[in-house]
Amino acid sequence: MQGLLRNVAPKRFYFEDALITTHNHDFVNDPAFRKAYNRGLKASRGKNSHNQWRVYLALWAARVCSKIEGDFIECGVNYGVTSSAVMEHLEWDKLGKQFWLVDSFSGIDERQTTDEERKSGALETNEVSKRDGYYNCDIERVRQNFSQWKSARVVQGWIPECLNQVTASKVAFMHIDLNSAVPEIQAFKHFLPKLSPGAFILLDDYAYVGFDVTFAEWNKVGRELGFEILALPTGQGLIHIR
């Protein structure tokens, strides 16, 4: 398939993170994007690479939300790839906003995994991810990474217990990437009353392969609360607050 596409459109071929397209993706060569993306890679020190379109979507949503009243929140920071890219892209300390960076830095919360997630191997994946360094468990490394910005606030703890440490009165943007349905939805519901009109919530795992439980649970909440989720070909999901 890759060979065929390269023959059909050799100058317009994108294949990364399970996304294949021959449509325009000139953003990958944009200097502003490259600078932001490379800052994200610096945070990961080689982990979590090859996800340019995911980061591109985060940068787009963050740019829109930078003009909206409220702070930014990331639930599920890991190494800080996406949030570092966003902060670099927006010249963060010039915005007058706080970026709240919430994570256990201990993998997923096993107490909150559903029966379906356990059956799909979530606990085993959690242990392997911690062992192999896909999940970052070194909070000091994270603090060092974000020391570049005065308006970055690292919050360590389990969701929802730690969320009272986030003192934002308004929220303009959320990036949720907890790899577990229950705490993702708890975080969303906690901050829902504080979301400003026009805010975006970017869900990292919503439509991603292997996250069927997350997809179903988010759709259920969407029906209950009356909002739509846009499924993106990257596996992400996007919610717009009106």
Predicted regions and their residues:
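N-terminal auxiliary segments of SAM/dcSAM-dependent transferases
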Residues: M1-I20
